[in-house]
Amino acid sequence: MSFRERLEQTIAQNHSLLCIGLDPDLERFPTGIPRDPEGIVVFNRAIIEATADLVCAYKPNLAFYLQYGAAGIAALATTRQLIPPHIPVILDAKLGDIASTSAAYARAVFETLGFDALTVHPYLGSEALEPFLSTSDRGVFVLVRTSNPGASEIQDLPVGEAGEPLYLWLAERARAWNQRSGNVGLVVGATYPVDLALVRQRCPDLPILAPGIGAQGGDLERAVCAGLTEATAPLLVTVSRSILYADASARFAESARAAARRVRDTIERIRKEVAGQAGHR
């Protein structure tokens, strides 16, 4: 089964476009959770058990584990094993290097650690991405329009004869790569709903991973409308801190579940409204 098929199967099973980011911040851990790599496993286990029926995917960010060295990587590997096998897990690592190095990264992420997908940056061109694109059962999400405030410094630069912004040009390139490999998605920040809509118009058939809802200030309704209108592929709405740290008490997992359910249900309501509007055109 391809990565895309597995993703869509989980979306249908859980009626969810919610992707929870597993980004542990020890300083924000609830009462009773050790503030060390072992505590990361305890915390993540509780979050996963509380939300596994509400998500379409999980997305751990490599940096939040790598900062603790070997013990942090061990916590990441254990976290991967804790997630039910039918739920896709995307490693947010933003990788990309010369071909031989990317091949080593691909083996580490897909084979050694067993992740289903990862995020990559396209700055080195298609040669650097080839090792990630070569297997249809693993997903590759290409950074196109990131959610951070400084994204426009580079991503809005005009390119080509038409002078279109770089992020749109990259989206077109990623779509071309997908025609060959079938496993490409895009990363487009929910903090830029106008740009998200433009990317979706160009790439209706590519999955989009949309970070930035919650702590980064993205508007959920605008982002979901932008990412689903004219779409034939999923929009994965990524939320991390506002779910993980919804409560600092011993009932943190229960509160995380409630927060995740609210987001999941809101997305589902908007999705149905968008689908209804499309049906009346």
From Swiss-Prot:
Keyword match Transport: no
InterPro entries: Aldolase_TIM, OMPdecase_type-2, OMPdeCOase_dom, RibuloseP-bd_barrel
Pathway note: Pyrimidine metabolism; UMP biosynthesis via de novo pathway; UMP from orotate: step 2/2
A Gene Ontology BP annotation from the UniProt entry: 'de novo' pyrimidine nucleobase biosynthetic process
GO molecular function: orotidine-5'-phosphate decarboxylase activity
Domain of life: Bacteria
The entry's keywords: Decarboxylase, Lyase, Pyrimidine biosynthesis
Record field: catalytic activity: orotidine 5'-phosphate + H(+) = UMP + CO2
EC number: 4.1.1.23
Active site: 94 (proton donor)
Stated family: Belongs to the OMP decarboxylase family. Type 2 subfamily.
NCBIfam families in the record: pyrF_sub2
Protein name, UniProt field: Orotidine 5'-phosphate decarboxylase
Lineage: Bacteria, Pseudomonadati, Thermomicrobiota, Thermomicrobia, Thermomicrobiales
Annotated gene: pyrF
